[in-house]
Amino acid sequence: MGFWKFPPFLVLSILVLYQAGMFHAAPFRSVFDGRFDPATLDEEESRLLLAAMVNDYEQMRARESEKAQKTEGSRIQKRACNTATCMTHRLAGWLSRSGSMVRSNLLPTKMGFKIFSGPRKNFWF
């Protein structure tokens, strides 16, 4: 008996789902609103279409270059700061780059405890 109740329920649920799907589907297009065919354009329409495409492309490139300039400007602005923190970081960077020159010119080559084990030399005149 349960078998006879199942097919009408199945048919009814399929119809409900079909109707619900129709409400969300794209609107019906008429036969005359076919796909766009560029071969049917006359010369003036093709020129207008080409001009619109070129204009759109130029606007897109202008937006991209404007966005790139904004990001580049913020990067330059960050590098050109003159606050005490920035100057301290610049000085630290300069000292770390010139550290090898300072070591070779000002510090003795022998370092460690053996440097003081030999006879004392008087550096004062």
From Swiss-Prot:
Entry GO terms, CC: extracellular space
Disulfide-bond pairs as recorded: C81-C86
GO biological process: adenylate cyclase-activating G protein-coupled receptor signaling pathway; regulation of cytosolic calcium ion concentration
TM annotation in the entry: none
Cited function: Stimulates cAMP production in porcine kidney cell line LLC-PK1 via the calcitonin receptor (CT) but not via the CT-like (CL) receptor.
Signal peptide segment: 1-25
Domain of life: Eukaryota
Name recorded for this polypeptide: Calcitonin receptor-stimulating peptide 1
MF annotations from Gene Ontology: calcitonin receptor binding; hormone activity
Subcellular location: Secreted
Gene3D superfamilies, per the entry: 6.10.250.2190
Family to which the UniProt record says this protein belongs: Belongs to the calcitonin family.
Recorded name of the encoding gene: CRSP1
Keywords: Cleavage on pair of basic residues, Disulfide bond, Receptor, Secreted, Signal
The UniProt record lists the keyword Secreted: yes
Propeptide: 26-77
Pfam families attached to this UniProt entry: Calc_CGRP_IAPP
